[in-house]
Amino acid sequence: MSRKTRLLELMMKRETLRLRQKADALCGLVGDQTRLSDLDEKLADLILENSKNHGSQTVSALRSQAFYGREMAEKREFAQNRLEFLGREIVTAQTQLAQSKQKEKMIEERASQERRLLAQDALDLADRLRPAQKIER
């Protein structure tokens, strides 16, 4: 194996590791997005339930309901902002993953081409070193 072939093989392994890391990061982002969207749905249900009229209430119950309504609305707004951010991050991570896959493919093609050239050079050298045979008629 030539030095260039070995370097290309090492580059390919390094790129494969990077690809794996980027894929793991993408899976983490998607998992976060799923959990956060579930939380957003639960908060929406709680806000809807809290906003229903429960008949006559005391002043402290109304204050409590208003306080919890504001708190849930703030949490939901935070969750929605985070979901929007995660959406952008997922798109970025997918783009980087695709670029990394393309780079790995290019390095793999260069390594296989180098291996073919090395094998062809070895065959050519063997043909040159082989003694000439006489053809009898």
Where in this protein do the model-derived segments appear?
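Charge-rich amphipathic alpha-helical interaction elements
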Residues: 1-137
